[in-house]
Amino acid sequence: MKKYLLIIFSFLIFNLAHAGMSNNDKSKAWECSGIYMANYFLPPGESFEYSMKEKSMASVKVLKSYALEIGISEKEWDDGVNKAVDKYNGAKYDKVKTEDCHTFVNSAIPDGEERVKKVVQTLY
């Protein structure tokens, strides 16, 4: 009986550990990574504040580190990001989508806003 309880308990703990990001959240995180990367590599003539480029790159790093923390494999994460980058490559700056992604990072990742601020400070 103890053996069965241990197995059930282990299964529950494993599932809770991976509950940090649903499939919808993962898709949104990948989309945001693609948008952020497109923001960083804007086509010539596109206006964009440098501080927003910093925040975009920091947000990409925070999203990836959080994904790895909660158990998403690096290969799975990178594959998803690459698809999103291909989708948004060369896109013009979209303030609404970018702000939506900032809101997502701040709400989906524990201390997301603070993590992004920390990474921005390390970019130099």
Model-assigned labels for residue ranges:
Residues 21-22, 90:
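Residues embedded in well-ordered secondary-structure elements
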Residues 50-124:
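Compact alpha-helical subdomains of small soluble proteins
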Residues 4-15:
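Sec-dependent N-terminal signal peptides
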Residues 17-19:
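Boundary at the C-terminal end of the N-terminal hydrophobic targeting segment
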Residues 15, 37-38, 106:
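Charged, amphipathic alpha-helical interaction segments
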Residues 22-72:
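Short N-proximal segments of mature Sec-exported proteins
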